[in-house]
């Protein structure tokens, strides 16, 4: 079989258009536009590209985008002070600190300093805990974006045997929680997993997030499986590929995400959704 391509670019554009319409309706009703503060410390080239795409997406949907580009020499105390200021700013609904941070700054301390109601990346322990307890508020962007893709393609996940490859805090772990909520029987594999091939071959829904080009051979894929490739790897020849050998996997899967143009655009679209949610649910004046 030839797999159907899950077009993340198109779905992400739909999500962004929906958010833009809601923002226009807010402004027409006399409410303020949502505000997102994006903080970049240092000059990591990859981080600069990610940050630029997030800021552009913000402006496209009509958000107020605030940029804070701090030098590499910024101290942890200075960064925490900025976060405190943004936490107290009523015009800011979301605070995004681009990772990785320079050496000497504690990622965990910084992420925990962001108020949970402004944590639009969904990384704060409070928000992760809410997801674990089946009462999610702001959800980690990549896992939530993947669930949106599955929903928009009307893929019924209940009862599927789902396998997540990679147990990172950003994708793998929260993804496993989203899949449990979506009714899957969920396995998470990691570097200590024995016989990885066995797990892959039994997956109805496979989500791969390890950051290694071609890590999963196409002939491991179960016939008719749904394959979600989160990896974004740039080869020496400049080509961008995923963690799955796409051409071979696409011959066996029923659905597959391409790289680029699959999961990546959904991460930014979900960040935009989260910022609107934070604005409407947590920061708008609530009717008594």
UniProtKB/Swiss-Prot annotation:
Keywords: Amino-acid biosynthesis, Histidine biosynthesis, Hydrolase, Methionine biosynthesis, Multifunctional enzyme, NADP, One-carbon metabolism, Oxidoreductase, Purine biosynthesis. Pathway: One-carbon metabolism; tetrahydrofolate interconversion. Its EC number is 1.5.1.5, 3.5.4.9. One of its GO terms (molecular function) is methylenetetrahydrofolate dehydrogenase (NADP+) activity. The keyword NADP applies. The keyword Hydrolase applies. Catalyzes the oxidation of 5,10-methylenetetrahydrofolate to 5,10-methenyltetrahydrofolate and then the hydrolysis of 5,10-methenyltetrahydrofolate to 10-formyltetrahydrofolate. This enzyme is specific for NADP. Belongs to the tetrahydrofolate dehydrogenase/cyclohydrolase family. Homodimer. This is Bifunctional protein FolD.
